[in-house]
Amino acid sequence: MSDFILISDGEDEATPPPSKRARKNRTPTDLNLDTEPSLQKQPPGSASTPFFLDETPLSDDVTVLKSSFGSGTGASSGRENNFFGKRVISLESDSEDSPGPESSKKYEPVYTDSWKKPCRLEFGSSDANSDDDPSWMRRASFQSSLSKDAIEVDSDHEKEDTGVEKMGRKKQTITSKSTSLSADSLPKKKMSKDEKTRAAEEKKLQKEQEKLQKAASKAEDAEHKKLEREKQKWAKEKDKALKCIVAWIDNKVLEGSFGGLLISGLKEKCITYHVTTNPIQRSIVWTMTLPEDIAQSLPLGSKIPYVLLLYEAEDFCNLVAKKELLENVYRVRDEYPSYTMCYLTNKLLSYVNKKERVEYKDPVNGCGWRKPPIDEAIAKLSTHYIGVHSRHCVDEAEVADHVVRLTSSLAHCQVRKKLTRLSVYADGTLMSKNAADKHLIRESIWLKVLVAIPKVQPRYAIAVSKKYPSLKSLLKVYMDPNISVHEKEFLLKDLKVENLVGRDTSVGEACSKRIYRVLMSLDGTIKTDDVENGAASFTLPPSDLI
């Protein structure tokens, strides 16, 4: 069994160390304590075995107890009795409590040269029967070249250091906890009575405002629904809307050959009209007597943004010959901004042909009449202006019928729900009635979008939807910057199209390019044929040009 080595400093003498059976054959041991151990030569006559104690701890079978076996003999004798039969290594040190001249040298510096000399704790040689002799502890002498003052350990100083370290750790934990606390968890100041009453009043006011806002929003929703219902009633009842429209006819219109037929046609349809002097001669404008709530919902209120200009053939030819047509357009625009304009002529072509025939048959007696650039002037109205149209009627009856039909259409358009591209076609799909996959297209919005692209057949749309089930999945590839534009244009060309009869074909390059350029076009007003030819790739949208 291993020996028991006790190292202690100021231990209680009443508590005995743990007992352990002593070895009978104990070998004398020299214990060298050194921070930098160095092998030393052993005297030839010595039988003791030196052991060097480095900074590493001792093994488990050796127990070192630090003890202050002072100079007093009483303490040493008590220790001898306690450790009788035990192998104990004792490191002596001066007791801190014992007064003496040595205590004045307690805090003197230790020189480095003195540490290089080894400290030795030697046990004298013992006989075989020395196990029962307690005097072996007395023979233990601590031979060291260092003075006791130099190697003395200040236990109080160590306690102070450990106390400071503990306090520092506690402060770190407290600061970390305080920083982790949020602003909400910090203790709040106690509110006074006035502050509490103010906070309660503010909460009450806030709740009342929220209630008022909810009530106002509900009232607005109810009014909006009521207005929509009234509009639907007006849209369904055509006669009701027709009775509310009023036509304001200029005096010059009735002076023409079609004045009588026009008035009779309006009376047959029970349309209200007024003959007056309009700011623009030969014009007809319309207004509607609608309820205030419906009139306020319209962009121009009770006014209808449309103006009709009626000309006889001779008057229109003179207007073009004098180059006053374009000036007339600007004058009407100044008077009726944002209005749609229409030039209506009566017997224009027949009048021109008649004049040309007379001039051709009798050039000598002719007045030298030449055809004015009517075609060029009408073409300019369509190409150079937005919202400017022209209409040529054969006779007076057609003029009167056109005015009556136009009046009824304007009356219904004001209260009718606005049409969109998808609402123009039945069920919002552009496909033939005999399409085999009609039910699939009606159930899928993505298929409706693909079919709405011109020249994209339903079977091509279905092939694309199988590979890319949504618009987002296709646009994700189209928006990938790592793929070139050429690859994106021909992305869909190899998709298989299932045919009921014959071989399966592919979508093709033309359809793939059309789908890409239509979906990725920067200008929504451009035509699809132009987009297919790459027009959108070289032009900027109107918003960027301003």
Swiss-Prot record:
<dbReference type="GO" id="GO:0005634">
    <property type="term" value="C:nucleus"/>
</dbReference>
<feature type="compositionally biased region" description="Basic and acidic residues">
    <location>
        <begin position="149"/>
        <end position="167"/>
    </location>
</feature>
<keyword id="KW-0540">Nuclease</keyword>
<dbReference type="InterPro" id="IPR006166">
    <property type="entry name" value="ERCC4_domain"/>
</dbReference>
<keyword id="KW-0227">DNA damage</keyword>
<feature type="domain" description="ERCC4">
    <location>
        <begin position="278"/>
        <end position="478"/>
    </location>
</feature>
<keyword id="KW-0460">Magnesium</keyword>
<dbReference type="GO" id="GO:0003677">
    <property type="term" value="F:DNA binding"/>
</dbReference>
<comment type="similarity">
    <text>Belongs to the EME1/MMS4 family.</text>
</comment>
<dbReference type="GO" id="GO:0048476">
    <property type="term" value="C:Holliday junction resolvase complex"/>
</dbReference>
<feature type="coiled-coil region">
    <location>
        <begin position="188"/>
        <end position="245"/>
    </location>
</feature>
<dbReference type="GO" id="GO:0006281">
    <property type="term" value="P:DNA repair"/>
</dbReference>
<feature type="compositionally biased region" description="Polar residues">
    <location>
        <begin position="28"/>
        <end position="49"/>
    </location>
</feature>
<keyword id="KW-0233">DNA recombination</keyword>
<keyword id="KW-0106">Calcium</keyword>
<dbReference type="InterPro" id="IPR047524">
    <property type="entry name" value="XPF_nuclease_EME1_plant/arthr"/>
</dbReference>
<keyword id="KW-0255">Endonuclease</keyword>
<keyword id="KW-0234">DNA repair</keyword>
<keyword id="KW-0469">Meiosis</keyword>
<dbReference type="GO" id="GO:0004519">
    <property type="term" value="F:endonuclease activity"/>
</dbReference>
<keyword id="KW-0479">Metal-binding</keyword>
<keyword id="KW-0132">Cell division</keyword>
<dbReference type="Pfam" id="PF02732">
    <property type="entry name" value="ERCC4"/>
</dbReference>
<feature type="compositionally biased region" description="Polar residues">
    <location>
        <begin position="173"/>
        <end position="183"/>
    </location>
</feature>
<dbReference type="InterPro" id="IPR033310">
    <property type="entry name" value="Mms4/EME1/EME2"/>
</dbReference>
<dbReference type="GO" id="GO:0046872">
    <property type="term" value="F:metal ion binding"/>
</dbReference>
<comment type="function">
    <text>Interacts with MUS81 to form a DNA structure-specific endonuclease with substrate preference for branched DNA structures with a 5'-end at the branch nick. Typical substrates include 3'-flap structures, D-loops, replication forks, nicked Holliday junctions and also intact Holliday junctions with a reduced efficiency. May be required in mitosis for the processing of stalled or collapsed replication fork intermediates. Plays a role in DNA repair and in genotoxic stress-induced homologous recombination (HR) in somatic cells.</text>
</comment>
<dbReference type="Pfam" id="PF21292">
    <property type="entry name" value="EME1-MUS81_C"/>
</dbReference>
<feature type="region of interest" description="Disordered">
    <location>
        <begin position="88"/>
        <end position="232"/>
    </location>
</feature>
<keyword id="KW-0378">Hydrolase</keyword>
<keyword id="KW-0498">Mitosis</keyword>
<dbReference type="GO" id="GO:0051321">
    <property type="term" value="P:meiotic cell cycle"/>
</dbReference>
<protein>
    <recommendedName>
        <fullName>Crossover junction endonuclease EME1A</fullName>
        <ecNumber>3.1.22.-</ecNumber>
    </recommendedName>
</protein>
<dbReference type="InterPro" id="IPR042530">
    <property type="entry name" value="EME1/EME2_C"/>
</dbReference>
<comment type="subunit">
    <text>Forms a heterodimer with MUS81.</text>
</comment>
<keyword id="KW-0131">Cell cycle</keyword>
<feature type="region of interest" description="Disordered">
    <location>
        <begin position="1"/>
        <end position="55"/>
    </location>
</feature>
<feature type="compositionally biased region" description="Basic and acidic residues">
    <location>
        <begin position="103"/>
        <end position="120"/>
    </location>
</feature>
<dbReference type="GO" id="GO:0006310">
    <property type="term" value="P:DNA recombination"/>
</dbReference>
<feature type="compositionally biased region" description="Basic and acidic residues">
    <location>
        <begin position="192"/>
        <end position="232"/>
    </location>
</feature>
<keyword id="KW-0539">Nucleus</keyword>
<keyword id="KW-0175">Coiled coil</keyword>
